Amino acid sequence: MRKIAVLSLFLCLVAVCRAQYIGSQYVDVKLGYIVDESQVQGTFGFGKVYKAFKVGANLNYRNLNRDLVKANTVTVGPELAYYALKGRKFSLLGIAAGTIGYQKAKAKSDLVYLEKSKAFVYGYEVGIRPEMLLSPKVALFAEYRFEMLFNSILRNNNQVGLGCVIYL
């Protein structure tokens, strides 16, 4: 057990040391709120930072539980964020992302009960993200995104979110 722990620690250290400069790789976590439908969304992302932009991938999960509809949606996709402003403590990024995923929904009413529906969903997101650096490796951000999700119960959404970025 001790050997496994030492080996795991060594592998983590090697992964961090492989970064060419501080901030070359990142992991972020976001808790979002879809304003149009009062829906919560969780996002986990990772990627690489370049001089003027970030390239990464996101995994999203959202749960909609309303009187007439109950739906769960999981999406993944690439993300490109461009630094519109980049300072020592504050950055402003423009975001473009693609999404592809799966939605499972159940629609119901007092008169009609419909079976579960499953759908392949795809779409895009555009947005803006101000980011504040707390230390060389940790940043907090707020975010606004407009999302168009085809084949979904909810096609277009306005999202706001708060999150944290850890630079490796």
For each of these PLM feature ranges, what is it?
Residues 47-51, 81-85, 129-133, 165-167:
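Structural signature of outer-membrane beta-barrel channels/translocons
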Residues 18-64, 165-167:
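Short glycine/proline- and aromatic-enriched beta-strand/turn motifs that initiate or cap beta-hairpins
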Residues 29-33, 44-48, 57-61, 78, ...:
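Transmembrane beta-barrel strands of outer-membrane/channel proteins
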Residues 24, 55-74, 100-122, 153, ...:
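Flexible, solvent-exposed loop segments that connect beta-strands
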Residues 29-43, 65-71, 88, 148-157:
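Solvent-exposed loop/turn segments connecting transmembrane beta-strands
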Residues 1-24:
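Cleavable N-terminal export/targeting peptides
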Residues 156-168:
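Outer-membrane beta-barrel "beta-signal"
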Residues 51-57, 88-90, 132-140:
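Repeated loop/turn-to-beta-strand initiation elements of outer-membrane beta-barrel proteins
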